Amino acid sequence: MSAPRNVSPPRNESALLSPCPKAAALALLGGASLLTLVIAATPSCAEGTAAATLSELSIEGAAASSLTVPSVAAQRAAVNATVGSVAFVDAKDFQDRYANTLRDTLKDVPGVYVQERYGQELRLSVRGSGISRGFHLRGLELLQDGIPLNLADGSGDFYQVDPLGLRSIEVYKGGNALTFGATTLGGAINVVTPTAQTAFAPNILRIDGGAFNTIRENVQVSRISGPVDFLVNGTITNSDGYRDHETQRTQNFNANLGYQLAPGVETRFYAGVYLTDQKLPGTLSLFNALNNPTLANPSAIAGNQSRKVETERIANRTSFPLDVGKLDIDTWAIHKSLYHPIFQVIDQDGWTYGIAPHWAGTFEVAGYRNDLILGLRAFAGQNSAFQFVNVAGQRGAQTLRAVQSASNYEAYGENRFWFLPDVALMAGAKAFSSNRTYSNKGGFSGANAFPASANETYAGINPKVGLLWQPLPDLQVFGDITGSRDVPDFSDLVQQNTLNTTFVLLRAQRAVTYEAGTRGRIDRLSWDVTLYRSEIRDELINFSINPGLNIPAATFNAPRTRHQGVEAAIALDLARDLIGTGDAVVVSQIWTHNDFHFLADPVFGDNQIAGIPRDVLRTVLTYRNREGFHVSPSVDWVPQGAFADHANSLRVPGYALLNVQAGYDFQNGVSVFVDARNLTDARYVSDISVVTDARTVAGGPVAFYPGVGRSIFGGIRAGF
């Protein structure tokens, strides 16, 4: 029986599917020498770079792949075969912009809310995951090449993700991430690094620069030799930042080595080193955020607050084709060292390690096609957590010595049964058991004088069922019901203030999500639209104790809440062959509607959950011709800002940002671009450290991250 037909990518993927590449390697990145090499790229390289100069109106054909890493076309097809809301982003859609953070790569994906705080620190939320957390990541699994980046307790941050080291991004919203074993409310985002087979070119040199004394250098080299292939990518970024005390220094190194052990058997090793030194500007009052946005919080300066992270990661995937399907076995280990002077000096060092076999195959059942995925995941980790009095960013007297341990055991499966040629019934489930153990070793004055320990085990089953109807090759309609569980991480469980540290037993967040949607293309019109509703019990809700001092938020279980919304992206080819043969004008509209609120809460009633605005819109108009010129003006519009408190007594203003991107791709493999943002220098609030009731804070909460003002960046890239 023939395979079910997957939705073909639209001609202009940036208009729809993009909504919906240790120190030894880094030493290669000398700034002046890199710029010289970029400019020196010659036309003799043109033949080898033809694939890197892509017309937006070309449909990408089959690209090279390997057993461990499918081609980009196959990655897209696998994502689009999902019964549920997903998105695929090809790196070519953001390589001609200043892509420093995940916002720069995901801002065209409906349903994904990404807002900058400072440097690479973001609020990243899908369908309200971790909605009111004012730092890092919760409720969403972040993977690289299908292998988790999150720590064993489920927490994560964004500093390991280098946009210049990526080939594609896969977004699986909510329970649709079951293909990885992820069943959190937000789902999973899988960033895929290039291999020698999928890289744009064997050699890539790039330098970006611009506002706030920003300069970034990137180099990538890849080769194939018989059964061996390798790729090395390194990026150095230096920037003073928009605000005072926001200096950013990062060094990212990614590499992979593939080897064909035997015909049809392949292993691939991944290695990464990620060094971050980020000064923290802190939050401001609403007045200062809107009128003096470049200021730093005085407490941030007095405490020389910063975040210094050294992370090393090694992983392996070994793939075996079987008589039916393919077996992948993933193993990984992550070492992370954190030095983080904020209200106190947070000094942590820990390891996360895991193994995950995964089988996927297609076979017939009574003459009907059946697609089956089965997987196991076992991962654990331990983190030494010390705290000290913060003396201008240096360790003072020690106040805490603790050990945080987490373990997780999971089994999952998903089946698609094609009972009609164009209709599939999907069913799946995940069973899990997760333990969190905290041991305070004591020995200090005050609340941490005596040893104390606590642990909690969370277990459950998350089911999933749905239907996929594909009446045409370029049209899908789907509906599904999924269950999710979010287990608290140690930032939730270990709550602290200036006086003590306490382990708080919290319940796991449970949700049932209903969604229905459609995606496809008919002639010049492309779309991806999903409606969803999540009924949530015991949602993990955060509020900041004192955001001005950068004290981590407290967490509680809200008895009942509801998240519902619309995720929509629509693109229309307005004109073709407008000025010359092969050029096109495309308009795209992305709309994310967020309705997140308490349900008969004993304290907050039916109030909106603070932290995320109700509507987020983005409009992009793109012109591109066959000679390589492209220009894209865009508007980011938030009609009404988010509430700053769960009492709904304070709301930040809405805003609109005008941006323009332009560039030229030369035939010799050299590309140049300009990325101009917030051209009107609008003053706005980008993110909030949510409080319970702003009316009770004397002088008003110091809880606001100002948005970045007018900024212009440019870059030059050579692929040969």
Model regions: which residues?
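Membrane-embedded beta-barrel scaffold of Gram-negative outer-membrane proteins
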Residues: 317-321, 326-339, 470, 476-482, ...
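C-terminal beta-signal and adjacent terminal beta-strands/loops
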Residues: 537, 575, 585, 637-642, ...
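Structural signature of Gram-negative outer-membrane beta-barrels, strongest in the C-terminal barrel
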Residues: 365-379, 402-535, 622, 626
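Extracytoplasmic beta-strand/coil segments of soluble accessory domains associated
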Residues: 75-76, 83-86, 103-147
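Transmembrane beta-barrel wall of Gram-negative outer-membrane proteins
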Residues: 202, 209-238, 243-281, 306-315, ...
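Short acidic/polar hinge/loop motifs at secondary-structure boundaries
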Residues: 147-173
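Gram-negative outer-membrane beta-barrel transporters
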Residues: 425, 433, 526, 531-535, ...
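Face-selective signature of the C-terminal outer-membrane beta-barrel domain
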Residues: 266-272, 305-445, 468, 528, ...
